């Protein structure tokens, strides 16, 4: 007997592995730059350049890009000035996989977990970093669901059940290039040379449209520069500017549930002349690596059972796993803490604050998913001390929050939570203490897998050596309260419709309903009708 089948497409993670690598190297200061007096700030970013797969091994080619700002002596008046130094460190790492990744979609995410840059002497620095490499191997799995039979003249009785599930209709990676320009306001001097920049992506919103994935957000831009005037004073400016972008997505569904992750893989900040020819414009160009997924909630009828009165039907069933969406939201968590300033620091003004979120653990509790982590904050300041005019403080502010879930099985759920800094503020409570306030966004999606038994194949044969004339055409039956309409109809070679026609007490029951205990029924065998 030929069955009708419909396919459901699922993206399945075959295997994943996370490994940590340690990078360590020394770098010399260029001859054109002054000696290092004190390292004030540091910045780093780990980028994956390519992934090569050989069966159960993945070779990761990547680069650690870093920069430091230090204070050095000016050649003219011997005063301390901020100086920037950039560098990069390439790495090649083999990651073992628990599956054969040949032919699979293999992706790698690099996360800089720790960066330590120290001066060995006034002309050399030591760079040490810990980078976490997470390799994920995915494949498309086609799940076949039987929905009926092809034989139109077959008098088969079908038990169809509705079920709801979610399937991924988009699973792709692409780059989003952001180009924005900010201008130094009136009252600030023209830019002579750019010393330092910090660019943070915040408040990112994504949604599927008919044109593709629409992305919007804010760029928080901070610059420090040497003024283009006789005094050559150090100046800084911080602002936010909105950005938008569109990524082409084949088969984009505006009603789809999008879940998008992003990671900065390239940053370029340049000073450009404005319309008057003065260096007052700053061009910011970022490249975001976008991990784009979109899900569709579906409802479908599946054939769970079948029989033909008067025939023996051999059914082969198969268990398939699907998943349903439990929650998709963006939780907010407020974090605050006080940072102690050492007594020897004559703090005069906070210049800039940057932060990132580090998650330490997830735990399923009755209320939902408990998240424990910390906000790693760096506060850049200036002092009233001419011998040490600027510096920065690193601090860790722990937090605990809960993503609420209702009626879930903690042993089954699959979830992804992407944390990011949405708001950050640092203010001086006193010369000895800085108050830090942050708002963390926890972009969350959670699924619960479930199994369904579907008919894969069936074979029917007419019963032989059965004398139907010797069998009663009608049977009296008293329900025990354990069987459904379908169970009884299948056992006694009748149909649910025929049972409802002959018995008014069950006219409102469907085939999958249990017949109440004590209900008296008259069953007419269809094979004898």
Residue ranges with predicted function:
Residues 1-471:
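Membrane-lipid interaction segments
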Residues 462-501, 505-529:
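Primarily a LysM-type cell-wall glycan-binding module
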